Amino acid sequence: VWFAMFAGLTTASVPAAGPSTPPPVSTPAPPTGEAALDEPFTLAYGSTAAVDGGNLTITFEGIVEDSRCPSDVMCAWSGQVIVALHIEAAGEDAQTVELGGITDSEGVLRPQRPELSTVSSAAVGEYTVELLTATPYPAHANEPPSEAEYTLSLVVRR
């Protein structure tokens, strides 16, 4: 079975600073797109969408697992995809959620199977975020997609 595991760790070098220089401050990335409630939208790897006038932001942090059977391989199990989303809702603590499941060969999530521990939607405050698609579908066993190639389709409901 083919796996592409998300490392999720980055390092940055910070120049040496004297005692009077404050440490760098991490600020959230500005939204790279806007989305409406109840309307599907796409989110590329590393991008952030502002939903409902910015009351909810969703950032596609990475691929936790993509064990979907590549198109050029015969597998006993079709595998699944799990993605990590950083979600911030107004008045709520920010959280990272993992959504996923089994998809068809076009990356569209199929109805969830009870024996799998993955979920395709999550409640955050007054919102429900649902994963609809995860593409690209792996085509070749020896050439898994890079994280930068992934795009998700999501919908947010209140």
Task: Describe each PLM feature range.
Residues 1-16:
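Sec-dependent N-terminal signal peptides
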Residues 15-158:
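Surface-exposed, beta-sheet-biased, low-hydrophobicity segments with strongly acidic/polar composition
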